[in-house]
Swiss-Prot record:
It comes from Haemophilus influenzae (strain PittGG). Its main location: cytoplasm. The gene is xylA. This is Xylose isomerase. It comes from the Bacteria. Binds 2 magnesium ions per subunit. SUPFAM superfamilies: Xylose isomerase-like (SSF51658).
Length: 439
């Protein structure tokens, strides 16, 4: 097989003093931190769609990226070539996982029969490549938003035949994920929302997507899939109002349909930005609600109101993200998937390596800094002191339901309670965090 990235053999760890652009400065896969290797902590994955499918097009211009496999008039042969190049890239980068949508890996064809045949054909190839390389599938999913049939939604579509088509794709993608040993299955409602209530039955659409998710859970148990089901929140884009706005909204949806024990969340940094939240907030919320599953690692631009899907480059932001994950015990089946794309001016094929190497080093350094914060209890001691009153008899009685509004009102009057404000010490804590990050 001809090498596409023939200038390099394998990306390796060379340390902080290295000036080699094709080397890791901080990511040492075998370095042990808090009892696990970096590789075990981060569980890195490359996404198929942005990395191997996007041609650099945007709303204002045609594709700018030269991708030889996209020029093949035989679309299935092009998909085979794409699989070869994808696994060459994955192997040389040295990441353990990848992720895909069904139509990322295989052409959809002109009928449902062609869709199924093409998809199964490429899954056969991916299965062989996984055996050959040891690279595994972090998660699979179905693209139920690109085809025009989904312009009014998939599970939320006013036409039940479109609902059935989406079910067909998810059925096949879940089965393929199971076959390939995928550790999760993701559901992103790309067009599960609406543009205007003038033509929308909101209650009905919520019931439709609720039933769809119940069917997904039923199928998971029917086929014996041991992985985790994940919903990926996003507030808007492509629709104006998305039903899976943020982590808290998703949790309310799961509770409504009795799915809170069955489905967790896959959190994307850029989606948190669009929702008006910090990345750290979304992860902390998911951990507090016990629905934290996996991460789509990228970044957005606070000045832009759309999904820019840039590679993560902030150690400051990701140290706090990593801190929340470590506090929660780390990933189980999830990991860091780079749902990020190079800029459309980055037309050199090796820009893909620069982007991933830099992002991986950012996560590795963030992991080291977060581990130090956790070990030294940089923040936790102060947080524990701040809430110490809730460990008192009064605090425990309130939490255990042994008090009422009336008994508390009587207590305050009897003891003439006059609690004094205590400093939140935000500036001091920010200084402590910076000391760790820049040490």
């Amino acid at each position: 097989m001809t090498s596409y990235f023939d200038k390099i053999e394998k990306i390796s760890f060379e340390g902080e003093k290295s000036t080699n652009p094709f080397a890791f400065k901080h990511y040492d896969a075998n370095q042990v931190i808090l009892g696990k290797t970096m590789a075990e902590h981060l569980r890195l994955a490359v996404c198929y769609w942005h990395t191997f499918c996007w041609n650099g097009n945007d709303m204002f211009g045609l594709g700018s990226l030269e991708r030889s496999w996209q020029k093949n008039p035989n679309l299935l042969a092009g998909a085979e070539q794409k699989a070869d190049i994808a696994f060459e890239f994955l192997n040389k980068l040295g990441v353990p996982y990848y992720c895909f949508h069904d139509v990322d890996i295989a052409p959809e064809g002109n009928s449902v029969r062609e869709y199924v045949q093409n998809f199964h054909h490429i899954v056969d190839i991916l299965e062989r490549k996984q055996v050959e390389t040891g690279i595994q599938l972090l998660w699979g999913t179905a693209n139920c938003f690109t085809n025009p049939r989904y312009m009014s939604g998939a599970a939320t579509n006013p036409n039940p035949e479109v609902f059935a088509w989406a079910a067909t794709q998810v059925f096949n993608a879940m089965n393929a994920t199971q076959r390939l040993g995928g550790e999760n299955y993701v559901l992103w409602g790309g067009r599960e929302g609406y543009e205007t209530l003038l033509n929308t039955d909101l209650k009905r659409e919520r019931e439709q997507i609720g039933r769809f998710m119940q069917m997904v859970v039923e199928h998971k148990h029917k086929i014996g899939f041991k992985g985790t089901l994940l919903i990926e929140p996003k507030p808007q884009e492509p629709t104006k109002h998305q039903y899976d706005y943020d982590v808290a909204t998703v949790y309310g949806f799961l509770k409504q349909f009795g799915l809170e024990k069955e489905i967790k969340v896959n959190i994307e940094a850029n989606h948190a930005t669009l929702a008006g939240h910090t990345f750290q907030h979304e992860i902390a919320t998911a951990c507090a609600l016990d629905i934290f599953g996996s991460i789509d690692a990228n970044r957005g631009d606070p000045q832009l109101g759309w999904d820019t899907d840039q590679f993560p480059n902030s150690v400051e932001e990701n140290t706090l993200v990593m801190y929340e994950i470590l506090k929660h015990g780390g990933f189980t089946t999830g990991g860091f998937n780079f749902d990020a794309k190079i800029r459309r001016q980055s037309i050199d094929p090796y820009d893909l390596f620069y982007a991933h190497i830099g992002a991986i080093d950012v996560l590795a350094l963030s992991l080291k800094r977060a581990a130090k914060m956790l070990q030294e209890e940089t923040l936790q001691k102060i947080v524990n002191e701040r809430y110490a009153g809730w460990n008192s008899e009064l605090g425990q009685h309130i939490l255990q339901g042994k008090t009422s509004l009336e008994t508390l009102a009587q207590l305050v009057q009897q003891k003439d309670l006059a609690p004094k404000p205590v400093s939140g010490q935000q500036e001091y804590l920010e200084n402590l965090v910076n000391q760790v990050i820049y040490s």
